[in-house]
Regions:
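Short, ordered loop/turn segments at secondary-structure junctions
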Residues: 10-11, 40-42, 106, 115-118, ...
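Short hydrophobic alpha-helical runs that function as membrane-insertion/retention elements
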Residues: 36, 59-61, 101-102, 182-185, ...
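Active-site cofactor/cluster-binding pocket
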Residues: 56-58, 63, 302-337
Length: 349
């Protein structure tokens, strides 16, 4: 929700501070929008006493009214775990019509995964060790293959070995299957037995083929994972790389990051020199807040403020001419304080 600032004059007295607090509270109640009381200087002893007496918080200090990132329309997108599969990340992007996902851990940004990164993952088809290199969790493999875990620990990780397809006889399989490999195969008992005897770490049984009690028992004794999938061998081989965790392909270095208190003028300058569409925004504690896009930045509007207890530029916060003054509420004389659009004025003697 867009926030409007309600602020009194410099060197504020009790009248100025309390007017800002009261009017912001009134506007919040009658409009349903967000108005925040601010101050343009330090509070004096009298004001501090009054606020403490009535248990009212002191408004935060506002140095100027230049537009900041926190004034922009930041798009909040829930972060994903680095363990999420490429397939699930793609589905999330498609459902939410977004091109970038934040990868977070405890609300801290770890990296970004983009559609371009996912496209790159599809091109890594010649590296049959990539599942192990990426430390892929068996749970991801089960889900990606629409499979069922028959034996083994789904929370374990495929850490060593390569991915192979056992499309030949057991005699030939012995020549290319090595210890800790992940083997994709069909319903042939002899092939399944050979893969176990070669000490594979995982068997992917395709087309929902039955798995004998003997094979299952041998796998359990050797702590070998067996996954049953309804897909054929070709489809399983195509899908399996989509189980790789996003942290393997995400961008984590040289990210262009902005903070809530950054000024928009600076942000525009930086954005003009980069090719990215979406930029992650962090708060002052490093918590991920959302994305600011080029398009949203181009449609930015000035900070909207309401002046109370004054209406002269020399009394106002610095650079007041850079803001849109939407209202002036004062009991003094009216002075010429230009803004666009013209403010609504209330003056009472």
């Amino acid at each position: 929700m867009y926030k409007r600032q309600v602020i009194g004059h410099k060197n504020p007295d009790t009248d100025s501070i309390c007017s800002a607090i009261a009017y912001a509270n009134l506007k919040n109640k009658i409009t349903g929008e967000k108005y925040i009381a601010k101050r343009a200087g330090e509070v004096n002893g009298e004001t501090a006493y009054v606020l403490d007496k009535f248990q009212v918080s002191v408004p935060s200090l506002l140095d100027n009214v230049h537009l900041q990132v926190k004034d922009m329309d930041i798009r909040h997108i829930e972060g994903v775990s680095g363990h999420m599969s490429i397939k699930d990340a793609w589905a999330r992007m498609k459902d939410e019509n977004i091109k970038t996902l934040p990868v977070t851990r405890g609300e801290k940004l770890e990296g970004l995964i983009t559609i371009g990164d996912i496209a790159t993952s599809y091109m890594e088809v010649y590296d049959n060790n990539i599942l192990a290199t990426a430390r892929t969790q068996y749970r991801n493999i089960v889900k990606t293959l629409d499979g069922t875990l028959i034996s083994g620990n789904e929370h374990g990780y495929f850490l060593n070995g390569k991915v192979v397809i056992a499309a030949s006889s057991p005699d030939l399989m012995e020549n290319f299957i090595e210890k800790d490999d992940l083997v994709i195969l069909g319903n042939r008992y002899e092939s399944q037995l050979c893969a176990i005897e070669m000490d594979a770490s995982c068997l992917v049984i395709c087309q929902g083929a039955n798995i004998s009690k003997t094979i299952k028992k041998m796998a359990e004794e050797r702590d070998i994972v067996i996954i049953q999938t309804p897909h054929d061998t070709f489809t399983a081989a195509r899908l399996i790389n989509q189980s790789i965790p996003v942290k393997y392909f995400m961008s984590r270095d040289n990210l262009e990051i902005f903070h809530l208190n950054d000024y928009v003028e600076h942000v525009k300058e930086v954005m003009s020199k980069t090719k990215y569409r979406d930029f992650p925004i962090l708060d002052n504690k490093g918590k991920f807040c959302g994305f600011l896009s080029r398009r949203r930045l181009m449609t930015s509007r000035k900070k909207q403020v309401i002046l109370v207890d004054h209406n002269e530029k020399k009394q106002s916060i610095s650079d007041i001419e850079t803001a849109n003054i939407v209202e002036i509420v004062d009991h003094h004389r009216i002075c010429l304080l230009y803004t666009s659009p013209s403010p609504r004025d209330r003056t009472r003697s």
